[in-house]
Amino acid sequence: MTLNGYLSTDFHIKSPAKKFFQTCIETMDLPKDDVTVEIEEVPLEKKKTTFRIEGFQISEWYKSFKGTITPDMATWQNPDGYKKLEGTMTITHVEDNDCDRAILTVKYEKINSDIKDPGTIMDTFVEFFKEMDEYLVEDFN
């Protein structure tokens, strides 16, 4: 069994991509120096904007969830079983598209082969981001 790996998932967001991304950065207190924004032209004169932050440390921020995880959220998984637990968040917005896309990737290295892949950690992050998205949609309208 390998000790290193990646987990990746994507989900749609309803709130404005830029607002969602800024809220992620603020909520998770992530370093703004690691943020990249790429704007490119897409056929039919639309613009595609990609917001990205790479290599943010998940463990401490995830541990702050422990006391606040609701029954609706994923069960707790101890992040101390990993030497490395880094996240990358990418948000893509295309003009005139009703639904933006978020991609969350977790890169991990387990301390031993008895440790499970961090699937529960990933599920908890996704549930948090979906709840945040719903809040932003309500706040934006």
UniProtKB/Swiss-Prot annotation:
Superkingdom of origin: Eukaryota
A single GO BP: defense response
SUPFAM superfamilies in the cross-refs: Bet v1-like
SMART domains linked to this entry: Bet_v_1
Pfam families: Bet_v_1
Name this polypeptide is given: Uncharacterized protein At1g24010
Organism: Arabidopsis thaliana (Mouse-ear cress)
The organism's taxonomic lineage, starting at the top: Eukaryota, Viridiplantae, Streptophyta, Embryophyta, Tracheophyta
